[in-house]
């Protein structure tokens, strides 16, 4: 999924978000990360720092849900997926529920995956929800969110010039520029497709039918809603992504052959509408 750029104004999240937090972290450098062990340790520390800043920012907005009946649906699924994916990622993974009017999920540097309450209302079965989460943990596995953050930070530094990066106004200048670039922050088609395929593998490792992501594509295509998760939007080639998933399934019948492609085989979920939520403070 792409990092969130603009959230609906009718309630919940207003994430000019983790991208803006880049300006508070001077440890991110203008040069690409080197291959030395020391530089890799520095990069991991930078990622942890950025992840913590994102979390603190969302917590300050009071949109992270501490307790809700929705967790009774989310936690069993997310726990199984985290157990399956964690060996492939070097920082602890954690799944959080956040309040928003848009069905969405997104992974951020540092290992956090945020799932909006509206996605639980939209998803019709466990497999669709699992497919979304598996797609997101795949962005962590491939370090996509951190690489995108570093790339954007480097581009800004080149564009703004070294002179303005000195003094107390540097962060403000970077922030203003980032606001103007939020709409362009997108994962590439290849990155999204890779997350689809890795996500399918994670789903099977967690015990979930990997066809759930295909069904979710179809659900949004058939929906009257104009709101959809970022990783399903702005990609006119969704059909090619579905085709790539089907080809992936066919390439390994030992892994995927036991799962039904029929939506009728899915496990429905039922969540209480307008479920009460207590927010972290």
Q: How would you describe each model-predicted region?
A:
Residues 114:
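Conserved beta-strand segments that form the floor/walls of ligand-binding pockets within enzyme
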Residues 127, 137-153:
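Catalytic Zn2+-binding segment of zinc metalloproteases
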Residues 146-176, 214:
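Post-HEXXH active-site segment of zinc metalloproteases
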């Amino acid at each position: 999924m792409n990092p969130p750029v603009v959230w609906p104004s009718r309630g919940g999240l207003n994430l000019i978000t983790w991208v803006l937090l880049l300006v508070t972290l001077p440890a991110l450098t203008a040069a690409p990360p080197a291959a030395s062990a020391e530089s890799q340790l520095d990069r991991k520390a930078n990622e942890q720092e950025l992840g913590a800043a994102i979390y603190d920012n969302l917590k300050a907005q009071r949109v992270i849900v501490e307790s809700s009946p929705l967790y009774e649906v989310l936690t069993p699924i997310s726990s199984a997926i985290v157990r399956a994916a964690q060996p492939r990622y070097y920082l602890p993974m954690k799944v959080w529920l956040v309040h928003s009017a848009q069905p969405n999920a997104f992974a951020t540097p540092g290992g956090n995956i945020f799932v909006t309450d509206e996605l639980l209302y939209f998803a019709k079965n466990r497999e669709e929800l699992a497919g979304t989460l598996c797609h997101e943990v795949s962005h962590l596995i491939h370090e996509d969110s951190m690489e995108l953050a570093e790339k954007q930070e480097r581009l800004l530094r080149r564009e703004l010039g070294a002179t303005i990066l000195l003094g107390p106004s540097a962060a403000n200048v970077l922030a203003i520029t980032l606001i103007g670039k939020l709409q362009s922050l997108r994962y590439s088609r290849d990155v999204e497709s890779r997350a689809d395929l890795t996500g399918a593998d994670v789903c099977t490792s967690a015990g979930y039918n990997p066809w759930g992501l295909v069904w979710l594509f179809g659900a949004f295509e058939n929906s009257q809603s104009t709101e959809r998760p970022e990783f399903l939007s702005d990609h006119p080639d969704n059909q090619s992504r579905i085709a790539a998933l089907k080809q992936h399934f066919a390439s390994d019948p030992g892994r995927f052959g036991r799962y039904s492609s029929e939506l009728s085989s899915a496990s429905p979920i039922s969540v209480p509408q307008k479920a009460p939520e207590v927010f972290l403070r």
